[in-house]
């Protein structure tokens, strides 16, 4: 338990190495990737109901990090336009198989699953691990709406131990999201 407490302190005090990057808006990304503008995808809605669900989930999340009721820091979750970008990317590409590493509460997972649900096709396989005593399988993906889980398969373990088996036993992966 002491080593876990030390690890939490290390996590809290961890300094990130910042790197240069140029932020790109969704509209610019679509143009760079597909040669189209956002107006070409005007039929794509913004998943407002999903955003409301996720906002409500985080408002209702109780406890302090780290605890069984709040096993991940809130800033583990994607922010800004990342979720809507994943949603729109999946709506445009209509993938059959997506693999992601790292789920935590399941914000990016929810946006992907919303698109798959609306596409009425595709499957998401997610990999996440339980590496702290206060983390539980039940909290992994706990923000994901129940009605979106039918196209989701969660594999518990590290990417190093689980990913190779997924690659050997699945069809080609259309989108791979490494978020762990």
PLM features per residue range, with description:
Residues 72-180:
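S-adenosylmethionine/decaboxylated-SAM
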Residues 11-36, 40, 44, 151-180:
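Active-site segment flanking the S-adenosylmethionine/decSAM binding pocket
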Residues 28, 32, 52, 56-59, ...:
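Charged/polar, solvent-exposed surface patches and flexible loops
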Residues 39-82, 88-93:
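Class I SAM-dependent transferase core
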Residues 12-17, 30, 37, 53-54, ...:
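A general marker of short, structured functional hotspots
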